A protein has these predicted regions:
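Short helix/turn-capping signatures at newly exposed starts of structured segments
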Residues: 1-116, 122-125, 130-143
């Protein structure tokens, strides 16, 4: 379960975002989350939902700590380049922004060029839209 206001993803009793690299490795060995590698390095992946919206969750590490988490909406109407358009991505960006406003229970602290940000004690919660990649995502960035 994703709890955006607390900066948490709970699997059972465990908050995986408070987990160490070793604990994430252990969860990957148990098959709870996936450990993946790309050109940049190792990251973890899982699928979870919040208020009926399904997300692909990418957990990026830096210096053995969680650096950021990206939430990609799995039910996006844009499944590939042939589905993508400026209007579709702006609609998705607005949908994700409104979704977070409802989840957080308040207006964002900052709204500038394709980025909407809420500030919390644990860090930042953002919705951003990258027009060159036709991608709108939610990010958690930890302090």
């Amino acid at each position: 379960m994703i709890i955006f206001t607390d900066g948490k993803i709970n699997i059972g009793e465990n908050n995986i975002l408070a987990a160490s690299n070793e604990e994430l490795n252990s969860l990957a060995e148990e098959g709870v989350i996936e450990k993946r590698k790309d050109a940049i390095g190792t990251y973890y992946y899982l699928e979870d939902e919040s208020q009926g919206m399904r997300f692909g969750v990418f957990i990026s590490l830096q210096d053995r700590k969680i650096n950021w988490v990206r939430f990609s909406w799995l039910d996006s109407p844009c499944k590939g380049w042939e589905d993508a358009s400026q209007k579709a991505m702006m609609d998705e960006y607005r949908l994700l922004s409104n979704f977070l406003e409802n989840q957080v229970g308040g207006l964002p602290d900052s709204k500038v060029n394709r980025k909407t940000t809420w500030r919390f004690n644990w860090g930042l919660l953002e919705v951003s839209y990258e027009p060159r990649a036709y991608q709108a995502d939610i990010f958690m960035k930890f302090q």
